[in-house]
Amino acid sequence: MRKLGFIVFILSNIFLLITGCVPSQPTEDYELLPSERLINKLEANRRKIKSFEGTGTIFVKTASMDNSATFRIILQKPDTINLTVMGPFGIELAQALVTKDKFTFYDALQNTAYVGNVNSNAMQSIFRINLSFEDLLDAFIGSVNLTSNLYRPPDTYVVEDDKYVLTYSDSARSNTTLYRVDVRQLAITDYEMYGTENQLMLKGSYSGFELLETVAVPYKIGIENILDEQKINIEYRKINVNKKNIVIDFKVPDDATIIKW
């Protein structure tokens, strides 16, 4: 726990050092899909993105901090996240390499690397929000995993203005999930998860879409964990998807202090 607190302290200090929607068109111009076809298309689009590289600004707000930083992220499905946090003039302040099993977090200011096994505490310390590895992969890309809904109909399915609106209830987990999907670009614009007594627990918002590899990819992403008071907003300036020969340039210096977590 002391090491966890130390990593959180370091990341907080690093942040402290760094100080569109598509125009509306009538839905009559588009074929309205049955729910099964819609979910299949959304999930197929999500799976088209095999690799992702983006640069932009990330805004992190929790009960203990409210800061922003310039960042670069490389994602290689199914098992690699590489995040670089940069300061003024593009100076590297910190870098993290996370796979499903292991992580390395390098603090360039202290020339110290923290290595260990991936678990919920490690993920929250590095990315400052309580999400699983798979959910983080999707969060940075601006997608939502719909695999569990491929073979079951939604509890409700309606069209409101230019949005499909679907809800799914999960009695085993006592929650209900709502999705709003843009009719034109078949992209999820809003995601909400409710718990018992209709309490909002988690929500996501996605906007500023551009078609990349025939997939609508958002340049603005917001993820909020209501219960844990954690919020991340991402604004991308540049995105590349499915780039060939993508390179992750991450090597801990030979003289760095290594701390096993």
Describe the predicted segments one by one:
Residues A44-F52, S64-N67, I74-D79, A96, ...:
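Edge/loop elements at the starts and ends of beta-strands within beta-rich repeat scaffolds
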Residues P153-W261:
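Gly/Pro-enriched, hydrophobic low-complexity segments
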Residues F52-I58, N67-I73, D79-V85, A94, ...:
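One face of beta-strands
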Residues A63-D66, M86-L93, E197-L200, I226-K231:
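Solvent-exposed loop/turn segments connecting transmembrane beta-strands
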Residues M1-C21:
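Sec-dependent bacterial lipoprotein signal peptides
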Residues C21-N67, T257-W261:
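N-terminal leader/targeting segments and the immediate start of mature chains
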Residues V118, I126-P154:
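C-terminal low-complexity, charged extensions that often adopt amphipathic alpha-helices
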Residues T80-E134:
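An acidic-aromatic
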